[in-house]
């Protein structure tokens, strides 16, 4: 019998769904993938058993990139594949057959943010067309460490161009070279940045694990918005040599992964004292080759957790998830100190920007000179001129006022710079994290990592509803974000913040919280949501 119900065409269905806040899942159905959500340990077990090779695994990830990164959902997260990855994987397979296994990363495919030097056939460009086609002469120290550990570098990831330090009106995840990276959870939402490509790619199982970098928020925010664990280490735990710089006082590389265990396996391989980065000398005796020993399910029991209420309150759905996370930690045996506010939050913002502008000019000019970048783009001044000459390709949406403000700064001997740096350290360290931790005898401070992902908007730029990376970033202290829930299909993260070199304690707390809540779920490549 023919139905008497009115026919609804596709356009009307979409309109009705949008009007009710429903999500629309039908346009992008990712094909089944054997290694979706696969952990480092699970892949190692298969390679040890002889049922999987590293070369086959790399091939599978490359095939998945073709299906969902360059077509289908078209995430645009990987800016370049390593043309030598299959050969490297085959060589590591041969080592395994001879009985040599370098460690837990042997044969594991990994992606790197495209501001980390690799002395191979891949370019290192910070997403800028100015450096397109230019390879670095040698590996960054952290890349040397990863290769030595047996990791297979399968590609470079897109990023917010110049790690989001070109314009205050930028759109996270966009670069002139790589275009716009999309959030795999809801495709019209932003992945945050600047480690946008690493976050989207790892979330979508385009690699097992990935490396990002952070000056302020560039690991924590994209990890939070893409449902990942992200670790922003103490400055000096991981070398910065061979990484395109913004700030010598705040920059660090860090792991991004789908689980705490995978993130800390990667962290252990990244640490080490590097003579080319004097900040790492302070890590001697404070780093560990195996951070998985701190992953204990009972780590919350007896811990004192401070709730930074003045770092919440920016979104009702985030607050609801945050309160649920606090309840879970209490259930796990933690003593909750609520509130344990950080009184200096936001008071260092102007000083931080001054510090970053000074340090960016000094650090970038030194980096470009050391790397031997071809003229005329071998100085900040030359890059500014290049962008002006190529504005249609490099500046279609936003300009370069941060570049120009940095170029106007003087040397790091300027009194204004030294005063700003001292102010940042006092406000974020002495009167900030250190004071709160000591006053309340805390093991960690917790806060929501960020608000929900916003719609990507190239005309108006990013629309952050809130974020809490700055206090740890300005202090140079560690922070770990762990999935804590969702706001209408959009992932939300919980940040654990501590004092210098407290990674072991934070890792334990983050792991126990992860195991207690199991809040992460894989992305479904939904085209849009209309709420949150």
Predicted regions and their residues:
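Short helix-loop capping/hinge segments that flank enzyme active sites or metal/cofactor-binding pockets
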Residues: 107-126, 293-308, 357-429, 434, ...
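Short, surface-exposed loop/helix-turn segments at secondary-structure junctions
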Residues: 440, 452-470
């Amino acid at each position: 019998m023919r139905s008497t119900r009115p026919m609804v065409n596709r356009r009307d269905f979409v309109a009705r769904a949008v009007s009710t806040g429903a999500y629309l899942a039908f346009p992008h159905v990712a094909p089944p993938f054997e290694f979706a959500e696969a952990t480092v340990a699970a892949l190692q077990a298969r390679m040890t058993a002889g049922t999987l090779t590293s070369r086959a695994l790399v091939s599978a990830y490359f095939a998945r990139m073709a299906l969902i990164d360059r077509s289908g959902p078209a995430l645009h997260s990987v800016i370049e594949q390593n043309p030598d990855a299959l050969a490297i994987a085959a060589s590591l397979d041969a080592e395994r057959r001879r009985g040599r296994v370098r460690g837990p990363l042997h044969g594991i495919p990994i992606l790197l943010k495209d501001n980390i030097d690799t002395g191979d056939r891949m370019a290192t460009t910070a997403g800028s067309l100015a450096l397109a086609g230019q390879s670095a002469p040698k590996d960054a120290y952290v890349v040397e460490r990863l290769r030595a550990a047996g990791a297979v570098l399968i590609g470079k990831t897109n990023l917010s161009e110049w790690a989001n330090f070109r314009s205050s009106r930028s759109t996270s995840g966009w670069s002139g070279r790589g275009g716009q990276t999309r959030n795999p959870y809801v495709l019209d939402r932003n992945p945050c940045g600047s480690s946008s490509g690493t976050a989207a790619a790892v979330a979508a199982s385009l690699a097992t694990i990935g490396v990002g970098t952070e000056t302020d928020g560039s690991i924590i925010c994209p990890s939070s918005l893409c449902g990942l664990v992200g670790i922003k280490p103490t400055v000096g735990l991981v070398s910065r040599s061979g990484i395109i710089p913004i700030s010598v006082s705040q920059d660090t590389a860090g792991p991004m992964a789908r689980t705490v265990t995978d993130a800390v396996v990667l962290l252990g391989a990244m640490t080490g004292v590097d003579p080319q980065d004097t900040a790492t000398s302070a890590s001697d005796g404070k780093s560990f080759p195996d951070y998985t020993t701190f992953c204990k399910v009972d780590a919350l029991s007896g811990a004192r957790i401070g709730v930074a209420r003045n770092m919440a309150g920016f979104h009702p759905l985030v607050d609801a998830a945050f309160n649920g996370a606090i309840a879970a930690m209490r259930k796990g045996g933690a003593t909750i100190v609520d509130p344990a506010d950080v009184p200096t939050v936001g008071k260092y913002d102007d000083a931080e920007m001054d510090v970053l502008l000074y340090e960016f000019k000094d650090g970038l000019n030194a980096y470009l000179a050391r790397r031997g970048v071809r003229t005329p783009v071998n100085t900040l001044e030359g890059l500014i001129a290049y962008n002006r000459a190529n504005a249609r390709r490099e500046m279609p949406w936003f300009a370069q006022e941060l570049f120009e403000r940095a170029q106007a700064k003087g040397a790091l001997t300027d009194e204004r710079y030294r005063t700003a740096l001292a102010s940042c350290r006092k406000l974020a360290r002495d009167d900030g994290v250190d004071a709160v931790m000591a006053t309340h005898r805390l093991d960690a401070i917790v806060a929501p990592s960020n608000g929900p992902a916003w719609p990507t908007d190239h005309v108006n730029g990013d629309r952050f509803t809130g974020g809490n990376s700055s206090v740890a970033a300005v202090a140079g202290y560690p922070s770990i974000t762990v999935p804590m829930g969702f706001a209408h299909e959009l992932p939300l993260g919980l940040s654990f913040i501590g004092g210098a070199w407290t990674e072991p304690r934070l890792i334990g707390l983050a792991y126990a919280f992860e195991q207690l809540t199991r809040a992460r779920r894989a992305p479904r490549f939904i085209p849009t949501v209309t709420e949150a």
